[in-house]
Amino acid sequence: DHGKVIFNLTASFQRPSPGLAHQVPMPDLMPPEECRDFLETIAADPGVSEESFAHMARRRPFELRNHRPAADAQATQHYQWFRIAAPVGDDPLIHRAFLAFASDMGLLSSAMLPHGLNWSTPGLFSTSLDHAMWFHADIRVDEWFVYVMDSDWSGGSRGINRGSIYRQ
């Protein structure tokens, strides 16, 4: 980007090995079949401008199903079901790459929820300053996953957002 560094990556790897295992259980959520399609959700939101709708309605590689609390709920958590919309083969690295891509969909809006804001809010500027991700096992993005996103804090024109991705 004009000779300036805009991306820095630190990665570490491990060979699969046996050992102790546990994880935080997936929250009790509505299944994807009961959630609204992403485009239906944003089309029904009177706060989304035509320009923002056109941007958000662009073609994506994923089928998305949303559950967003009402704008006046001051919620700090929302979730989105997703799966790849077209076959991508069996290469586990391709599946991980698509999961990494999906991890950036919707996360920033978590800090907007408690304030009743959305991407159409005039004067709002939003970008990721850093992003960390851990892959604990092989996955297939042609299965349903749910991305549970929340924001613990916002202030000083910054917000902290976090997400956990669970297999259905």
Question: How does the language model describe each region?
Answer:
Residues 2-168:
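Terminal targeting signals and extreme-terminal segments of soluble enzymes
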